[in-house]
Amino acid sequence: MYFALGFPYLWIRQDAPRQTLRGKTSFSLAALPSAFTIFAQTACRSFFATPAHPVEKTFREKYPLLFSVNSPADLRTLAVNVLPQLAEELRNYILDIVSVKQGHLGSNLGVVELAIALHYVFDTPHDALIWDVGHQSYPHKILTGRRDAFLHLREQGGLSGFPSRAESPYDAFGTGHSSTSISAALGMALADQLRGDSHTQHIAVIGDASIASGMAFEALNHAGSTQTNLLIVLNDNAIGIDPVSGALEKHLQDLLGGIDTDNFFRTLHITYRQVSDGHNIPQLIAALQQVKHLPGVKLLHVPTIKGKGFPSAEAEQILYHYPGHFDRTTGLLKDSPRIRYQDIVGEELLHLARKDETLYALTPAMPTSSGLSILRTEYPSRVIDTGIAEAHTLTLAAGMACRGLRPFVVVYSTFLQRAYDQIVHDIALQNLPVRLLIDRAGIVGPDGPTHHGVFDLSYLLPLPNMTLIAPANGCELRAALHLAARYDRGPIAIRYPRGEAQDDTPTEETMPFGQGRCLRPEGDIAMISVGAMLSVARQAIARLPDEQRQRVSLYDLRCVKPLDASLLREVFTRSQAVLTLEDGVRQGGAGSAVALWAADNGFP
């Protein structure tokens, strides 16, 4: 018998008499789930916890022009010659908040003038304005009635760090992943055209290297064959999270440099215009007013500087993409002394690469945040940054595996789902030994629902030939990476969370293939922990009264597929109740896999 309790599954032996579970210690069936829930809530709150911020009155005095703009309608009443002052106040307001709250900094500093110009020229929210990637939407949010709420950026119950249709009518389309804006804006434009609406404007602001994604190319290809009222604003800062890779970037620089032969966009029947300075508000307004009245699909090429106006962010654009806490005056970052899971990945891949010349690391546009900088420094040719191209990355790795290389694909869990068909068709069905290192698995905190990595267990577990490992801490992650390097019998995935690693004490322990482990053999009520939930399980057990705690045994599953049948048989044979804890959705996850195993093996 199973009961759903948030993330966990709870199994209770059907023939267990009620008094057996309660016994002399009066053990409550709700005790373990309740203890878990308390710690889960505490963990979630810790993701959002931020220092107190100065009161709003201070900002009103500091930024009087910004605090006079409560909506784009207010913005449009201002004279053009005062808009640079508004831009300065807006930029400094973002710096004040993000230095304390944490968030995406460089991209937002780079689009301050562009956001002002767009809302000045277009009739938002009637005109649909879509911000690609979403992490460059802070100026847009502040100008559209959410200035005060920005004090609670990325807090639980506060303002999302990404556009959200549920949050504001000014957010025409929710964006957290990249390269979706042109498709969405084109869909809206086609719908309005079919309804006879020829006046509504549809604007897709795409930047931070998102234009080079396959989905953006597909949308451009379709858009060029239409006569829709669509404007694409290319925010070209020549960098994503890391420097842009790929041939398109050279073409874009040629266009900005005046080399306009073989213009890629014109060959697709898209009207092309550009400005010389994406931080010159009068120039931006003039260009936007011009393209606004042109027929058909248009593209305005806008060069900007990522981190504009904050010297540290301009000089170190990679670090200040998402800097964490930093000193508002000096720009100095407030680093954490503890090692991250991502650091472990980089260190161990470097160690393995020194012994295996067939090892290559692939990443879709995120080498630095994924921990690969250390490997790229020593072996630059063995770290392949494919750009924002998850589908291509997976099939590229499959092709490399066909030729005897050992590719490790390092990708965020939330972005891996963009390449699901490639995992199924190109890797799993062909049983190719591609190693998937699934970063940011589980709950990732204030980045919110677009970035939580809670689906990977459910969509990988059903796949044929797939092995899936969930290390509980830094030591197990190191062991799992070494296991993956030796495993050539098919695809293998390792999922691990964001941030500081738990228990990274050096160890010589290896991870036997397909085996979990028993950590507390004491009792007849079993907890099976999956991955990083082990620390939560231990804390939950510690909260129980002594007599109840003695009845709880604890298991670290480690290998989610294949399951350790020997371990599970021991668990279900000796236990009156079994609780599984995982940081993923309940349907189709590790708990349901354990439940299915129990049913198949006579433990209904």
State the predicted function of each range.
Residues F150-L159, S225-N237, A428-R440:
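A glycine-rich helix N-cap at a beta->alpha junction
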